[in-house]
Amino acid sequence: HTEFEQIKDYVVGDDFRRINWRATARTSHLMTNVYQDERSQQVVCVIDKGRVMQQAFRGMTYLDYAINASLVLSYIAMRKEDKAGIMTFSDRFEDFVPPSARRGHMQQILETLYRQQTQFAESDFSALTAHVNQHLSKRSLVVLYTNFANKVSMERQLPYLIQLNRRHRLLVVFFVDNELKEYIATRPDTDEEYYRHVIAEQFAYEQRLVVSTLKNHGILALLTTPENLSVDVINKYLEIKSQT
């Protein structure tokens, strides 16, 4: 059930059938009717299940952390009257739970995510992009959980990320390696420790470079630790929502 709420300027992507011809004639530019349910945003968690998500921290893989964060974000989004959806992919597109806020939807998300496991294959971002564009006609906030160890691994996927961001608001979420953080935090005493320290610093620099490169292309990026993932993702969602 949708109730009429207001008339606004037509923008590309609005439903042509909703054009208000009387208001258009009066203002001499296209106007369209807005209904209450259109104010809700679509929030779609896209989870990479490829081998980059197999890394473990405290007995859980990065995939496990991404699943937990997706569940929390979906719940919060629906409480905020947004529609939550889920996609998973690895070397092929796998699951899709269309965005919704209906009763029982959270259970469907839970059941879909409960059975997920990482794959040994390299993830296919090309297939993901094609399916996102096919399944999501409405501009959505797409929260992509993946992992980029360095700028080179990200740049291979950058054309697809740019394409996704053109149609949607893309937030790329990836992980700080906690062991690297510990290496950087400790003062090296031996040559071997110094060598490890230098490598850890280089990895950390590469990840910061990934964030700045994505931002330079207008793509939101969140680099976080596994244990802070859910809180950081929720805060980022609320920040984005306050700006729309």
Predicted regions and their residues:
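Short, contiguous acidic/charged loop-to-helix segments that flank catalytic cores in large enzymes
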Residues: 59-62, 116-120, 143-152, 160, ...
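Von Willebrand factor type A / integrin I
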Residues: 138, 152, 156-244
